[in-house]
Amino acid sequence: MNHELALHVIEQALQYGIKEFCVAPGARNAAFVYLLAQIPTIKVYYWSEERSAAFFAVGRIKATHQPIAVVTTSGTAVAELLPATIEAYYTSLPLLLITADRPRRFRLSGAPQSIEQVGIFSCYTILEKDLAENEFFQLDQWSGRGPCHLNVCFEEPSKNDNQECARSFSMGIFTPKPILCDSHLLDEFIQKCQFPLVIVGALNQNETTPILSFLRHLKAPVYLEAQSGLRENSLLENLRIESVEDVWNCSSQHGYPIDGILRIGGIPTARLWRDLEETNNVKVCSISENPFAGLTNGNIIHTSLREFFKNYRLSFKPIYSFQAWKDANRSYQLELLKLFEEEPLAELSLFHLLSKKIPEESKIYVGNSLPIREWDQAADWTNKHFQVFANRGANGIEGQLSTFLGLASPEQNNWAILGDLTTLYDMIAPWVIHQIQPLKVNVVVVNNSGGQIFAPKFAHLSFLNSHQLNFKAFADFWGWEYDCWHEIPTTILGSQTSRLIELVPDPSATDRLRKKMQRM
């Protein structure tokens, strides 16, 4: 009985186009484990811990642009999937959650490994099915624009779960459901705003060309976050605003009082985005693959970015005069570069120098909290064709190393830049690395002795989670190469295997740099 039910679920997943499964084996999902092991056309990653398995799947989705499944046993194993499910929900990723469950008669009984799994993910799945013996469904009901939960009720595991499966399986092709929209909200925004600023957040690689063309035709000032893939593009240099520190005052003082924000792509990391909650006279229009405005106000055009900008034509061509602001902005950047030279051991300076030394065409994953902000602020402007990624759906620090390993590519140098607390959150992540093709992996752990993002805001020391730990033992535990840097070496060679680099900023230099920047 269990075998037939498992067979139906896996057939649906394969027909949908799923070719990779992250499996945390247990007694209740044994029928899935045995069945998946017999299918030669798929890749199965085996995990001992479900939370990291799910974040690894998030990384695989980002790398392949294909749906990935996570398969768990029953009980609290299912609850471990919630953080990654939330991340996938807010970034519209096709994450399939296949959770084994005890039979329905055990619900609300408190029996061992019986929790209420139906509805456990609340609003964070866009489709949920609860299945038992002789119950069938079609997975093509799933739009693929967010997580799906299949809860599968099995009887007690038995020898019959390990049946040989002689059937051949047909593999489908993943085709997400199209999003239909019109462009009148963008037309209206362009017509009403005299002083717009465009902010480009996270984009997929196939979206950058039509968006680049749109930006060059619009000719409005644009702030490009690293995840856009356009940050260092020389074709946008004449439009590029490189710093948004004190952006409202600086733009107004130089004759360009911002009256509109056009957001393209993911929700921005920059502080100016949060400022919009308290800025009532600024119109906001967002164009995104994700259906979230990212604010309590503003319009959202939920659409396929590639198709939208391939077909969009400006109804008229406005003229924006922002050269004075751009010149002042560039002067600020030059002053900042001088400060990096004055304080080369400060944390922000180390980010700048690291960005100059990482090999061209590397794939870079930037962790949440300080690293993503410091990369956007300090990375060099030379176009080295980096691909920059992050988990910015819910901005959490869990699962970052697992996501990076899922994202990593055998054909590229792969770099993760993570905070110390972020790394401690995900120490099981390297479990999977021997199951992946040989990778060139460099994990930079910025060890600033705790959560320094809170240092300027909160006086109570408990916010910092201060520590005196180092990460050599972590590297040794997993058999990784280890380096400790207090400054950036003149030459950096990408590792040919797996390497952990502990980057230790000078706290006094970091504090001096922060104070100098406040006086700029």
UniProtKB/Swiss-Prot annotation:
Assigned keywords, A-Z: Magnesium, Manganese, Menaquinone biosynthesis, Metal-binding, Thiamine pyrophosphate, Transferase
Which cofactors must be present for this protein to function?
Answer: Mg(2+); Mn(2+); thiamine diphosphate
Which EC class does it fall in?
transferase
Source superkingdom: Bacteria
Q: Which Pfam families match?
A: TPP_enzyme_N
Q: Which residues cross the membrane?
A: none
Biological process, per Gene Ontology:
menaquinone biosynthetic process
InterPro entries registered for this protein in UniProt: MenaQ_synth_MenD, THDP-binding, Thiamin_PyroP_enz_TPP-bd_dom
Q: How is the cofactor bound?
A: Binds 1 thiamine pyrophosphate per subunit.
Q: In which pathway does it act?
A: Quinol/quinone metabolism; 1,4-dihydroxy-2-naphthoate biosynthesis; 1,4-dihydroxy-2-naphthoate from chorismate: step 2/7; Quinol/quinone metabolism; menaquinone biosynthesis
Enumerate the CDD domains for this protein. TPP_PYR_MenD
Any idea which GO molecular function terms this record carries?
Answer: 2-succinyl-5-enolpyruvyl-6-hydroxy-3-cyclohexene-1-carboxylic-acid synthase activity; magnesium ion binding; manganese ion binding; thiamine pyrophosphate binding
Q: What is its EC number?
A: 2.2.1.9
Describe the reaction catalysed, as an equation.
isochorismate + 2-oxoglutarate + H(+) = 5-enolpyruvoyl-6-hydroxy-2-succinyl-cyclohex-3-ene-1-carboxylate + CO2
Has keyword Acetylation?
Answer: no
Q: What does this protein do?
A: Catalyzes the thiamine diphosphate-dependent decarboxylation of 2-oxoglutarate and the subsequent addition of the resulting succinic semialdehyde-thiamine pyrophosphate anion to isochorismate to yield 2-succinyl-5-enolpyruvyl-6-hydroxy-3-cyclohexene-1-carboxylate (SEPHCHC).
Q: How does it assemble?
A: Homodimer.
Annotated family: Belongs to the TPP enzyme family. MenD subfamily.
Output the HAMAP family linked to this UniProt entry: MenD (MF_01659)
**Protein name listed in UniProt:** 2-succinyl-5-enolpyruvyl-6-hydroxy-3-cyclohexene-1-carboxylate synthase
Its taxonomic placement starts with: Bacteria, Pseudomonadati, Chlamydiota, Chlamydiia, Parachlamydiales
